[in-house]
């Protein structure tokens, strides 16, 4: 689905000089809020900053573990295939894309922008990932450009993986601030059943506080549809 107004210049950008690339890379690499990587079509990682490695592979991960390798060598194949397909589409069309996923229990939005650097054989794709809490709309995040928006079919729920599909649905609605009665109506269940699910969620996550459960749901950006997505 294409989002945003039409702009013929999107993705055309022109070639970046080496000095511009160096300055851009230095700025992005040091941004503590952004995970950044550079890919070739096919998903070969040319470069990544430490933040991206930690977002997707944990606090002890480093870029050296990914650079020079294909995504299929690093991540579960079914997830890697999804990401590579977005990279390849960006490179082929010259248009950017926004990819949403849940990874290690947190919602991540990744902006992919194709460009053609000087002295390169072809198009490369710059990927910038950020953690986004709650259900912020991509149209509001990126209102001025035309882009394709994708939700990955495969997610990594992290600590939430212990929950059943129904429990994830209940947790997602808790994160939206719904009461037990409202959740019961939305899921066509009794209030008693919803409270039982909520108690089970609390026991599994070792959290007996409704507000804290809602915060966890918001951190993951949980939506009802996420409950039935394929898990890693």
Residue ranges and their predicted role:
Residues 2-24:
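Short, charged amphipathic alpha-helical "coupling" segments at sensory-output junctions
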Residues 16-58:
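Sensory modules in modular signal-transduction proteins
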Residues 45-143:
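Sensory/regulatory domains in signal-transduction proteins
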Residues 142-169:
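Regulatory hinge/linker segments at domain boundaries
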Residues 157, 202-232:
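Basic, Lys/Arg-enriched C-terminal extension of HTH/homeodomain DNA-binding domains
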Residues 167-174, 213:
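Short alpha-helical "packing" element that flanks the helix-turn-helix/winged-helix DNA-binding module
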Residues 177-212, 216:
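Recognition helix of helix-turn-helix DNA-binding domains
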């Amino acid at each position: 689905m294409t989002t945003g107004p039409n702009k013929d210049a999107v993705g055309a950008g022109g070639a970046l000089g080496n000095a511009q690339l160096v300055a851009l890379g230095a700025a992005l690499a040091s941004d503590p809020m952004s995970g950044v990587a550079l890919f070739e079509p096919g998903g070969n990682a040319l470069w990544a900053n430490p933040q991206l490695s930690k977002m997707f592979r944990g606090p002890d991960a480093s870029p050296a573990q990914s650079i020079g390798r294909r995504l299929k060598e690093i991540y579960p194949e079914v997830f890697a295939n999804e990401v590579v397909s977005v990279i390849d589409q960006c490179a082929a069309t010259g248009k950017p894309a926004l990819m949403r996923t849940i990874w290690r229990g947190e919602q991540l939005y990744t902006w992919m922008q194709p460009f053609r650097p000087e002295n390169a054989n072809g198009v490369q794709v710059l990927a910038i990932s950020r953690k986004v809490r709650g259900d912020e709309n991509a149209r509001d995040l990126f209102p001025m450009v035309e882009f394709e928006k994708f939700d990955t079919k495969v997610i990594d729920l992290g600590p939430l993986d212990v929950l059943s599909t129904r429990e994830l649905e209940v947790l997602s609605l808790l994160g939206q601030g719904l009461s037990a009665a409202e959740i019961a109506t939305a899921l066509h269940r009794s209030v008693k059943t919803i409270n039982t699910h909520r108690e089970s969620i609390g026991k599994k996550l070792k959290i007996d506080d409704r507000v804290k459960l809602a915060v966890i749901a918001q951190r993951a950006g949980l939506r009802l549809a996420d409950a039935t997505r394929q898990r890693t």
